[in-house]
Amino acid sequence: MDNFQAYGEFARVYDMFQDNVDYQTWGKWLKQQLAAQGITDGLVLDLGCGTGTMTEILAEAGYDMIGVDNSGEMLAEAMEKRVESGHDILYLLQDMQEFELYGTVRAVVSVCDSLNYITEEEELEHVFALVNNYLDPQGIFLFDMNTVYKYQTMIGNTTIAENRDEGSFIWENSYDEETGINTYELALFIPREDGLYEKDEEVHYQRAYSLEKIKELIGKAGMELLAVYDAYTLEPPKEDSGLSLIHISEP
């Protein structure tokens, strides 16, 4: 399934509609986990970095950041933030399924359910293998994924809509239990100077993976699972957890 057409026009208002996401708490958790493994500086890759919000948080903490994303529109937003902050961040327009770096990094992070956009098992295994290839020995990979429970009971087959002065969107979800694929149909309405609205439509796909399947693919890629947590905690995931944070290591 070709899902990596990803964010286009929505990139312009992505941050506005994500203003309910507590990136600072998320970033604090990542920094704590990195520090616990003795990684307090050096190169860190943000895989599927989007508009660079988390990339900036980690750069502010002293890490030398690389951001990879397949959406030029999202990276354009990220580079505007880079100009404002003055952080020396390298952004690369690459598909996470085929990304290439000039060398290894001490850690890789991937947030905002970016890996759920990988809809085929062999492709997710390949991404894990690429991460393993570019990690320093004993490097770590921290990522989150939406759970099966979240797609089944929280967002699957629901419609989310929001209206603001800066724009409006309608986000329709359709979850297929058999394939584990959640289809997002997004309609975006952005006001123009003439008082009319510009409409843009995008379709995205994400897949729900069981924790058992994720563990299996991590092992096949040659990495070691260290821990799985409920979102932003050090507690194990619950049956009704919507987001799992996963901590794995390059042996």
Predicted feature residues:
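Conserved class I S-adenosyl-L-methionine
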Residues: 1-40
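Class I SAM-dependent methyltransferase SAM/SAH-binding core
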Residues: 45, 52-98
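A short acidic, Gly/Pro-enriched loop at the edge of an enzyme's catalytic core
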Residues: 100-107
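Residues lining the SAM
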Residues: 111-113
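A short glycine-rich, Lys/Arg-flanked "PGG" loop and its adjoining helix->strand segment in the class I
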Residues: 125-137
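SAM-dependent methyltransferase
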Residues: 142-215
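Conserved S-adenosyl-L-methionine
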Residues: 203-205, 224-234
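Residue-level detector of conserved catalytic or cofactor/ligand-binding positions
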Residues: 246-251
